[in-house]
């Protein structure tokens, strides 16, 4: 965990800085009417930050295990140890990073006075499901990733596209093709 932020000036702040900058960008674009998001149930900055943090949690759950497996490739070949340990370590890293980001989300919710509802109390179930989904995709792609270095690069492009077709920065569409895509989108 500490190795992830070694040799950086900002260290763990990078976990918070990126989603804050992305949120500020989307809020700016929405306020300038460059994009028109429409109404949300909670203040738009809290909405966008929530979506961004959840998306980053999913993307981390998908990419972190693949990166750690790739980095441990030689060790996997030479040393006999439970290979599941790499996946468990990466899952721990994803959960700790996500927990740190959730503290930011809680602060923003308190700042904007977002009321505590039963939906928010059930959110941890959805969050765990989201992280497990990312880890499952990662497990499925791990063998291919070890054979072909392109898998991670294709995933990065795919995640960028998937971000925009997932209701992260906009409410779930109620009609049209976007609604159909959102309906079948597992994220």
Question: Which residues make up each language-model segment?
Answer:
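Hydrophobic transmembrane alpha-helices and immediately adjacent juxtamembrane helices
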Residues: 1-187
């Amino acid at each position: 965990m500490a190795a992830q932020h070694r040799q950086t000036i900002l260290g763990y702040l990078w976990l918070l800085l990126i989603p804050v900058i992305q949120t500020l960008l989307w809020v700016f674009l929405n306020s300038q009417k460059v994009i028109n998001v429409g109404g949300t149930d909670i203040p738009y900055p809290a909405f966008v930050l929530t979506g961004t943090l959840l998306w980053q949690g999913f993307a981390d759950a998908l990419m972190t295990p693949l990166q750690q497996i790739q980095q441990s490739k030689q060790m996997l070949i030479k040393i006999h140890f439970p290979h599941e340990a790499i996946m468990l370590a990466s899952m721990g890293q994803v959960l700790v990073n996500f927990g740190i980001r959730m503290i930011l989300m809680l602060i923003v919710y308190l700042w904007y006075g977002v009321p505590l509802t039963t939906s928010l109390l059930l959110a941890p179930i959805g969050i765990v499901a989201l992280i497990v989904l990312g880890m499952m995709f990662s497990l499925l792609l791990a063998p291919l990733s070890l054979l072909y270095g392109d898998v991670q690069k294709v995933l990065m492009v795919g995640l960028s596209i998937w971000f925009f077709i997932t209701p992260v920065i906009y409410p779930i569409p109620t009609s049209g093709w976007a609604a159909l895509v959102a309906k079948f989108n597992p994220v």
